[in-house]
A protein has these predicted regions:
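Secondary-structure capping and boundary motifs in well-ordered enzyme cores
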Residues: 70, 82, 103, 123-133, ...
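Glycine- and acidic
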Residues: 2-8, 90-94, 114-119, 139, ...
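Charged catalytic and DNA/RNA-contacting regions of genome-maintenance
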Residues: 1-113, 126-129, 133-142, 146-238, ...
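Conserved catalytic alpha/beta cores of large enzymes that bind or transform nucleotide phosphates
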Residues: 291-322, 429-430, 434
């Protein structure tokens, strides 16, 4: 299929070829074609901050990771939109932040203006809240699946546009003016819908009772005929009761027999000769009369003709509405943009966000930054803010060490999320910030094996790391958490060190990087490489207990406190005590004096041996230690 009608040359790019294939498939498989697809635009990757799929997943931008709650995503925090179109657009903005500083600043200007005028913002959001999903309604119009309620929703939504335009006219901003000019009021369409359909129609036109009285003289006549017939039938019951003397006589209707007269068994001797028996039941019999049958034909005929005419009138209205597809779609896009910007302004006001300064530099300075998801979830308690300083020279890489559970991973994720928010045009949870736009964001956070592809946890980790090293640029932001932990200590440390060196030294990389690790040896990079700074997550020790302060401070940590975390997790006390003993042995010497691994010898036994024999134990075959519970 050619897309030349959309302004593309044949086989211009692979993306154009793919779009043509999708459009051809859609036309072949949709019953009513693709008339609602009026525009196809080619977007350059250079326009947007690229976030690879694993980073989108690790950062939980729009979808929670397996086992996480739905409110753990960035989109959940930002999406307080009032329309379905606005919600979908916000999702696109979260997944595809901008790189163009001018466009980012345009959005920031509107968010800031709305934030500073809360009364007008509230009025605008209240007006927008009544607008239905115009994009979906347009699709249904062109597929001939829109029902009467869809058209009423369309009419009520279009009727709110003049109010939206009046509110927007207050603001003197170029982007708002552009959005306002794109809004079409479509009073002719709104009027025709209101003059044709009743205010609360049934879901389907085939149910009847859809068209407003006075819309069609022919329909009014048919309805009048049917109504008169039903009135005649209603009067027939009292008339026949008086004629026959049967007070319990009833006139009913069902779809099988139509109208009928029902007489109980005890009154059958009073049935007139002109009654024709149709059905015998246990307690009664049902009859018809020639007069009743004739009136039934008139009523049913009028009803059927009225329903058929209603369906035709509705389909004509639906086809007429479909001729406004371009204008309705234009309204949907403009309203979605306003709704998304209002949502960002509402979040900025609700959570006390600041406006970041965004430019094309390599600077990334965040003062008092907060994790947006945790900050929103912890409204009743204080989230500990932290600073971030990265640039392309003296602060190119942050090596972050510290205890397990102290908040290293949260902190480095926070940095990526704040950059994404800033490049969306959103305000961010911080005291102040200078954000030099990034071209790509990469994260290597967490890992799990991929059984379906036969890949181990470490293989997945290395594949993600390879993707980062092969695609990062000096304008990228890299977030690394525990590189090399999926293999042996020496292998892992060697890989982590060489990865850090590659990022720092390779001319095509040299990206701003945050590197969280438990390999304390990596902190020595700061001694031999320019641009590396060591930071740690502060803790406070009280005897055998530690308190996590959640504060990022300069310098390297000297402990990981893994045994403390194991204790918090509820490991048996025997395991904790033995772990402390093994750790002490390992820290003293990796290999015991008798060429036995020091892990297998307790310090108490070693001390007793020395006291008894006056020297270290002599070499002898290794003996496996018994279980803790033997």
């Amino acid at each position: 299929m050619t897309l030349e009608g959309f302004g593309f040359r044949q086989k211009e790019t692979n993306a154009v070829r793919a779009a043509g294939a999708v459009l051809a498939y859609t036309e072949d498989n949709l019953k009513c074609g693709t008339g609602h697809i009026r525009r196809i635009s080619l977007k350059s990757r250079d326009e947007f901050l690229l976030i690879d799929p694993s980073s989108r997943r690790n950062l939980e931008l729009a979808d929670p990771m397996l086992g996480s709650a739905k409110d753990s995503t960035l989109l959940h925090v930002l999406d307080c939109s009032k329309t379905p179109m606005g919600g979908r657009l916000l999702r696109q903005w979260v997944l595809n932040p901008l790189r163009n500083v001018e466009r980012i600043v345009e959005r920031q200007d509107i968010v800031g203006t709305f934030k500073d005028d809360p009364l007008t913002l509230a009025e605008l959001r209240e007006t927008i809240s009544g607008i239905r999903d115009l994009a979906r309604i347009t699709t249904k119009l062109n597929m001939n699946t829109a029902n009467p309620r869809d058209l009423i929703s369309l009419s009520s939504s279009l009727s709110l546009i003049p109010g939206v335009r009046n509110i927007l006219a207050i603001f003197d901003l170029p982007l708002i003016a552009d959005i306002n000019t794109r809004l079409c009021e479509l009073g002719e369409l709104t009027g025709r819908i209101l003059n044709t359909l009743i205010d609360s129609p049934p879901a389907s036109a085939t149910d009847g009772g859809v068209i407003r009285e006075g819309c069609s003289p022919e329909l009014d006549e048919l309805r009048s005929a049917a109504t008169e017939g039903r009135n005649w039938v209603a009067q027939l019951q009292s008339k026949e009761q008086e004629r026959t003397g049967i007070k319990s006589l009833k006139v009913h209707y069902n779809r099988v027999f139509g109208f009928y007269i029902e007489v109980t068994k005890s009154n059958l001797e009073n049935v007139p000769d002109d009654y024709i028996r149709k059905q015998t039941l246990v307690n009664c019999e049902r009859f018809i009369t020639p007069e009743l049958k004739e009136m039934e034909s008139k009523i049913m005929g009028a009803d059927e003709k009225a329903k058929a005419l209603e369906i035709k009138l509705f389909e004509d209205l639906r086809s007429y509405a479909a001729t406004f597809t371009s204008e309705i779609q234009q309204n949907a896009e403009a309203l979605a943009e306003i709704d998304a910007l209002c949502a960002l302004a509402d979040c900025a006001s609700r959570y006390s966000y600041c406006r970041p300064h965004v430019d094309d530099s390599d600077t990334l300075i965040i003062r008092g930054g907060r994790h947006p998801v945790l900050d929103a979830a912890m409204r009743d308690s204080r989230f500990i803010p932290n600073d971030t300083v990265l640039d392309g020279e003296d602060n190119r890489m942050m090596i972050i060490t510290g205890p397990n559970m102290a908040g290293k991973s949260t902190y480095i994720r926070q940095t990526a999320l704040l950059v994404i928010m800033a490049q969306m045009g959103s305000f961010i949870p911080a005291d102040s910030a200078v954000i030099g736009v990034a071209d790509k964001i990469f994260t290597r956070v967490g890992a799990a094996d991929d059984i379906s592809r036969g890949q181990s946890t470490f293989m997945v980790e290395m594949l993600e790391t390879a993707n980062i090293l092969n695609n990062a640029t000096p304008k990228s932001l890299i977030i690394l958490d525990e590189i090399g932990r999926g293999t042996s200590t020496f292998d892992g440390l060697s890989i982590a060190w060489s990865v850090a060196e590659y990022i720092l030294d390779h001319p095509t990389c040299r990206a701003r990087t945050q590197f969280a690790t438990h390999y304390h040896e990596l902190t020595e990079l700061a001694m031999v490489r320019r641009g590396v700074k060591n930071y740690n997550v502060a803790v406070r020790e009280y005897g055998d207990q530690i308190i996590f302060l959640r504060q990022i401070v300069p310098g390297a940590a000297d402990k990981s406190y893994g045994i403390h975390v194991a204790k918090l997790a509820g490991l048996p006390s025997e395991v904790i005590l033995r772990a402390k003993e093994i750790l002490a042995n390992l820290e003293e010497n990796a290999i015991g004096e008798a060429n036995l691994p020091s892990v297998t010898i307790s310090r108490e036994k070693r001390g007793r041996y020395r006291a008894k024999n006056g020297g270290p134990p002599q070499p002898k075959p290794a003996i496996l230690q018994p279980s803790l519970f033997d």
